[in-house]
Amino acid sequence: MKRLLTTLIVLLGIFAGASAQKGLEINKVFGGKYINDPTVTETMMSGEQKFLRSHNLSTLATFRGESKTYSPILQPLVLADGTNAIGRNVRYRDGKLQYAFFILKPVETGGKKINRYLYYLNNENSKRPSAMLIYFDGSLSRTQAESLIRSLKK
């Protein structure tokens, strides 16, 4: 019985996270689509995870891949999702999106307001060029979201 209850809670957490992410273009890169590429790192967290709880998160999804290959894929998806953002901080270099932080419109799930954030960084000029995408949602504020991004970039 305890195992069944735990399974149901985990599934509910996954559903809640997926519903907040529903309708976003960035979903096209998640789900293991590029996992056969050894340069790609993908992480998806939802449900009752200690890290999520400690940061007031419901969902955390990250994608990192080689800049040359993945920035042309990620950039249009990020910009499409950022079109209707309620807050933004965007930087271009040489006509390419270098940095973006979007505050997406909140959604309501199970009677709770879920704040949603999207972060993109293209480090094409670094020693190890990479394009990184981070989506996260939860009850955290903008200030908490910015602090979380700083901690994840380290």
How should each PLM-predicted stretch be described?
Residues 1-26:
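Bacterial Sec-dependent N-terminal signal peptides
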Residues 128-154:
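C-terminal partner/receptor-binding element of secreted or periplasmic proteins
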Residues 99, 112-118, 129-131:
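Short, surface-exposed coil-to-beta transition loops
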Residues 106, 122-125, 137-139:
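Solvent-exposed coil/turn segments that connect beta secondary-structure elements
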Residues 24-73:
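Early exported N-terminus immediately downstream of N-terminal targeting peptides
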Residues 63-108:
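Mid-chain, structured segments of secreted extracytoplasmic proteins
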Residues 81-82, 123, 152:
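Sec/Tat-exported extracytoplasmic proteins
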